A protein has these predicted regions:
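Mixed-charge, Lys/Arg-enriched low-complexity segments
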Residues: 49-124
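Charge-rich, low-complexity N-terminal segments
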Residues: 1-4
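Amphipathic, interaction-prone secondary-structure segments
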Residues: 10-53
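Short helix-onset patch at the extreme N-terminus, typifying the N->h transition
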Residues: 6-8
Length: 124
């Protein structure tokens, strides 16, 4: 089972970010980033020194441009911010165990929330 510890971070000094990505055996791709400085709010939702990270998950489906579709990780955003390593490991475990079923649940929850605000007719 893959975990946060399997991520290999690269520091990008020019943009003040740490980045890592990891594809699970079932095809889901995790993208994890963090900023250098705690006080720079233009950076990702997380700072490397504090061991908090922003995570996105890309599914196994592709859009018309050939890009992987993001999995909606919350009702209002495609990313989760300020995640600790254990949180990311838990999310990885969830996708490794439930994969498409978990993705379908998250998509259904997002669609239901959009209907509450009459946004369901707007394309992502």
């Amino acid at each position: 089972m893959k975990t946060f510890d399997d991520l290999k971070f690269t520091h990008h000094k020019d943009i003040q970010r740490w980045t890592a990505s990891l594809e699970l055996d079932n095809g889901y791709l995790f993208s994890v980033i963090a900023g250098d400085k705690e006080d720079d709010w233009s950076l990702p939702y997380g700072t490397y020194q504090n061991e908090t990270f922003e995570v996105a998950v890309f599914g196994t489906q592709f859009d018309d441009n050939g890009d992987r579709k993001k999995v909606p990780l919350s009702l209002h955003d495609d990313v989760l911010g300020w995640q600790k390593p254990i949180d990311i490991s838990k999310l990885m475990r969830q996708f490794q165990l439930d994969g498409k079923a978990h993705e379908d649940l998250l998509i259904a929850m997002r669609e239901e929330k959009k209907k509450e605000f009459n946004l369901h007719k707007i394309k992502n």
